[in-house]
Swiss-Prot record:
Complex I is composed of about 45 different subunits. Its main location: mitochondrion. This is Acyl carrier protein, mitochondrial. It comes from Dictyostelium discoideum. 4'-phosphopantetheine is transferred from CoA to a specific serine of apo-ACP by acpS. This modification is essential for activity because fatty acids are bound in thioester linkage to the sulfhydryl of the prosthetic group. Keywords: Electron transport, Fatty acid biosynthesis, Fatty acid metabolism, Lipid biosynthesis, Lipid metabolism, Mitochondrion, Phosphopantetheine, Phosphoprotein, Respiratory chain, Transit peptide, Transport.
Length: 120
């Protein structure tokens, strides 16, 4: 008798939890929970790189274009390294040292970022 009563009570107590919470409610992902993994457009990359370079202290007041070299801006290798660190922070990536040594202009920075799928 006690065993049958316990079964009946436990079935009644468990049934609403499983039937309404786990079975009947559809699973819907809100758009806020979905990450868009599309690539960044070239225009956005260009604008952000120019923005990072333009904000560098030694560049203020100079015109920066996509084809501007760091040398034209009067920057040395340490300044270039500082800019590339800022670019890494801006795009959430890490540029390997051997690649960073090859980057000497905004155009090369943009080209590298276009080839980097993890840039955000």
């Amino acid at each position: 008798m006690i065993r049958n009563t316990f079964k009946l009570v436990s079935n009644i107590a468990v049934r609403p939890a499983f039937s309404s919470t786990f079975v009947r409610q559809p699973i819907v992902a809100s758009s806020m929970m979905v990450r868009n993994y599309g690539s960044i457009s070239e225009k956005e990359i260009t604008d952000r790189v120019i923005g990072v370079v333009s904000q560098y202290d030694k560049v203020s007041g100079k015109t920066v274009t996509p084809t501007t070299t760091f040398k034209e801006l009067g920057l040395d290798s340490l300044d270039s390294a500082d800019i590339l660190v800022a670019v890494e922070e801006e795009f959430g990536i890490e540029i390997p040292d051997e690649e960073a040594d090859k980057i000497t202009s905004c155009a090369e920075t943009i080209s590298y970022l276009r080839k980097t799928p993890t840039a955000k």
